[in-house]
Design a protein with these regions (language model features):
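Residues that flank catalytic or metal-binding motifs in active/ligand-binding sites
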Residues: 87, 102, 128-132, 172-175, ...
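A conserved glycine-rich beta-strand in the N-terminal activation segment of trypsin-fold
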Residues: 59-94, 127, 223
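A structural motif
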Residues: 51, 85, 91, 132-136, ...
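Conserved catalytic-core segment of clan PA serine endopeptidases
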Residues: 31, 99-163, 183-192
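C-terminal subregion of chymotrypsin/trypsin-like serine protease catalytic domains
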Residues: 13-52, 85-97, 192-211, 215-276
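Flexible, gly/ser-rich surface segments that form the specificity/activation loops bordering the active-site cleft
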Residues: 162-209, 217-218
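Single-pass alpha-helical membrane anchors
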Residues: 1-15
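A short alpha-helix/helix-coil micro-patch that ends at or immediately precedes a cysteine
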Residues: 90-100, 140, 174-176, 180
Length: 276
């Protein structure tokens, strides 16, 4: 069977409905269908050095989502580090990563497999966080996705979420299934379990079928993105800072928008049932 036809059939099977009545239940249903397809976690099956380019892995278990806005590589980092498009001209990075002298090259691969090379001309830090914003030398190609963030009222759609305090600090407890990348561009599963002072904490997934797709973070994974699924869309939550922890991008939304000079794109949760 033609590969494109097969992918179309699988995509229809996975994303038959854009949303379900319950957001978290819909995520788990989609994960189950995706995991039935494959256990291969690699976004790319191979790469070439001259000319530099990556081949998308058609057997990746999460290949039905759009990963084209995640950097395939950064020149001068030896394979570590990562970045994600938050506008046509800006990339979310981790501030503590020792990026090369500016300008340096960053690479993206669209869904058909074409590699695009851009230069990061400057990096702005969000004060008091590990968030950095890289500016590209030109607008990213329209075939590369710019990721959205959650709306401000996202918590109203999460069953069982609680808000408390510990030593005067607000602590949000929840179970939110997420997908994330590591330095080898492999797709893993996990659960956000706490939000404390603008930092999200990730643990192995409680959802049993997803546990086989979990991999603990390591040094070198910093800057690679963490997403939550909203229907057929990956929505950006942040980028790795340290093992199991990353800055919650919504906490610093205003500061990020001031740097990029525009509003971040916001995902639509209105089709889901509010539970709070």
């Amino acid at each position: 069977m033609n590969v494109l036809i097969l992918l179309g059939i699988v995509s229809l099977f996975i994303f038959g409905r854009k949303v379900s009545s319950n957001w978290i239940t819909g995520i788990k249903d989609t994960l189950n269908k995706m995991m039935d397809f494959s256990t291969d976690r690699r976004l790319f099956s191979s790469w070439t050095a001259n000319p530099i380019g990556w081949t998308r892995n058609t057997q990746c278990w999460a290949r039905a989502y759009n990963w084209s806005g995640t950097a395939a590589g950064i020149m001068g980092l030896g394979g570590v580090g990562g970045g994600s498009l938050i506008s046509r001209r800006h990339v979310l990075l981790a501030d503590h990563v020792p990026y090369p002298a500016r300008p340096f090259e960053i690479f993206f691969v669209n869904r058909p497999g074409k590699t695009f090379t851009y230069k990061v001309t400057k990096i702005d830090s969000v004060p008091g966080t590990d968030i950095a914003i890289g500016t590209l030398d030109q607008d990213a190609d329209p075939s590369l996705v710019t990721y959205r963030v959650l709306p401000n009222d996202w918590a109203r759609y999460v069953q069982g979420l609680t808000i408390g305090t510990a030593m005067g600090i607000e602590v949000v407890t929840l179970r939110l299934p997420v997908l994330y990348l590591n330095q080898e561009k492999m797709v893993s599963t996990g659960d956000i379990v706490r939000l404390v002072s603008g930092a999200a904490q990730v643990e192995p997934p409680a959802f049993a079928p997803a546990q086989a797709y979990y991999q603990v973070q390591r040094g070198g994974d910093s800057g690679n993105p963490i997403f939550v699924q909203v229907g057929d869309e990956l929505v950006l939550l942040g980028a790795w800072h340290q093992i199991g922890v990353f800055p919650w991008i919504l906490t610093h939304k205003g500061a990020i928008e001031a740097i990029i000079g525009q509003k971040l794109l916001v995902a639509d949760l209105s089709g889901f049932t509010r539970v709070a």
